[in-house]
Amino acid sequence: MNRKKQEILNLLKTHFALITLFLFIASCTQTYTPTKYSIEQFYQNNQIGGGAFSDDETKLLVRSNESGIFNVYEIDIASGEKTQKTFSEKESFFAIDYLPGTNQILYSADKGGNELSHIYLMNEDGTTTDLTPGENEKARFAGWSKDKKSMYFTSNKRNPQFFDFYKMNIETWESEMLY
């Protein structure tokens, strides 16, 4: 009989603990009403992303859609002043990085929404060069070599179904397929 009383007592303790836990959790709930935004507010939301510091860490390269479409901007770290570097009204331009040791800029963009993104170099005077000019080529920046004298990228220029890995010398702009 003593054993049966102990089992009943343990069962009551377990039930009491579960009921207490349930009541505690139930008392903690709050009614949440999410903020509602108009469609105008939703579309007026500016986005900023990416980010690459200049070698001297005085500038930050980003992309933003504050002009209505993504363009490349440069932010002065000391003042916070933002300078628009590209002025596209049609294609989105995405900041990649500064060319090592310079103020030249790498960015990517497609043409007319064809989703064949190329890698471009913007010189300090604002002129640009398509570094991956293949007509049906899609290219993506993959990083810098340790010595910062070459960049790596993937491209489907050999075969549209496959992306190969390339290394491009940033002094001669010649590329070689690695894999």
Regions found by a protein language model. Give the residues of each.
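AMP-binding (ANL) adenylation modules
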Residues: 66
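Conserved beta-propeller blade repeats
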Residues: 44-63, 89-109, 119, 135-157, ...
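C-terminal motif of bacterial Sec signal peptides marking the signal peptidase cleavage site
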Residues: 25-27
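Bacterial N-terminal signal peptides that target proteins for export
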Residues: 3-17
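A detector of repeated loop/turn-to-beta-strand junctions in beta-rich toroidal repeat architectures
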Residues: 69-71, 116-118, 162-164
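Multi-bladed beta-propeller domains
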Residues: 29-48, 74-94, 112, 122-138, ...
